[in-house]
Amino acid sequence: MTGALSRYKVLTAGVLSLVLALGVARFAYTPLLPLMQRQAGLGVGAAGWLASINYVGYLVGALVASLVGDPALKDRLYRLGLIAAVVTTATMGVSQYPIVWAVSRFIAGLGAASGMLFGTGLVLNWLIRHDHRSELGIHFGGVGLGIAVTAAAVMAMNRLGLDWRAQWWAFTALAVVLTVPALAWMPAPDGSAVTRSGRAMPDDPPSPLFLAVFLAAYFCAGIGYVVSATFIVAIVDRLPGVAGSGTLVFLAIGVGGAPACVIWDLIARRLSDLGALTLAGALQIVGILLPVLSPSLVLALLGALLFGGTVVGMVSLVLTMAGRYYPTHPAKMMGKMTLSYGLAQAIAPALTGAAAAWFGDYRAGLYLAAVAMAVGTALLAGLWAVDIRSRRLRPAMAADGEATTGSV
């Protein structure tokens, strides 16, 4: 097998694992939510709790990822996570009992974390070991692709008149198809500390202060992300002037996210990772607010494109940075970052669901998301400013060191 073909198959396995674990097992719930509310009697409060339970599962999965160090165990958990994604997708269509849905959403969250963190770690580790550029733009295109696929599928199945159960079973069939290459083309991990060419792969962790601020910023980004990602279909479906367009808007999120990660990789090369993250955070605030600032389908779609293009880009940049700090065990810091992101995702949907039950709609949640994103973006801007200053000081410090050495 040639190196180019190997890289293609590894990246394809990673992309399809994200389409399965995140797009189908996790995000199909969002475009199906209005249908389940109409046909299965799912209330707005219960919808929020189910979303939170899913994110709790994701949070637990992230905790496990941050603690697991054995590469072989990571590989096994990645594969078990994808199988869990298939089983839990099927379970959603089998029963109408809320407790069954809750268990299913929790395990789906575990599977999503496994595919996201262990799968991403395996891909990044393989790229670094084989002396490829340590960028995950193509890989994280699977998140946007998964969102687009689930939204387009729900739109098509709604036109065919399929009920909520049939749609979950259709997604189960898709999940089975995706599982085969996602498992077969992901290579077993290599636990050595050098690349194939013999170059060392030393871990270079950030300072505790940097990590604390970075975690806080990512927590805020988690709030900004999860409210829109979970409730945007229900929100848009109830807005005057754009009612019934929620699934189309969700499709736009996926369309915006699929190619965006590659673009953000290019922006990061010019601005640095932190500069790209700061810009993405600012644009995401605009994307969150556009659907509710004016009852216009054009603005709602533009907001969705911005939201999808920035949220997936931010996740890609953050997890790529985390993996570079720990190239031999990329999932270690990825798990810590995702714990922060996941904690926000576990809290915010339940609060949004409660607010929706109180106020009668979900729009208050979007304003909360925008405020949280503003705080997170400010923290990222602060880290970027410190990074710029340190980059400017580095040559001067090196020159001083050389001058001192020369004078001895």
Where are these regions (language model features)?
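Helix-breaking motifs and short loop linkers at transmembrane-helix boundaries and internal kinks
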Residues: 41, 73, 94-100, 294-295, ...
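Helix-to-loop junctions at the C-terminal end of transmembrane segments
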Residues: 61-73, 260-272, 356-357
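Conserved MFS/SLC helix-loop-helix module at the cytosolic interface between two early adjacent transmembrane helices
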Residues: 60-97
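Extracytoplasmic gate region of multi-pass secondary transporters
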Residues: 30, 210-251, 255-259
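Cytoplasmic helix-loop-helix junction between adjacent transmembrane helices
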Residues: 104-142
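Helix-loop-helix hairpin linking two adjacent transmembrane segments in secondary transporters
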Residues: 98, 129-187
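C-terminal transmembrane helical hairpin of 12-TM major facilitator-type secondary transporters
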Residues: 272-321
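A late C-terminal transmembrane helix in Major Facilitator Superfamily
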Residues: 328-361, 369
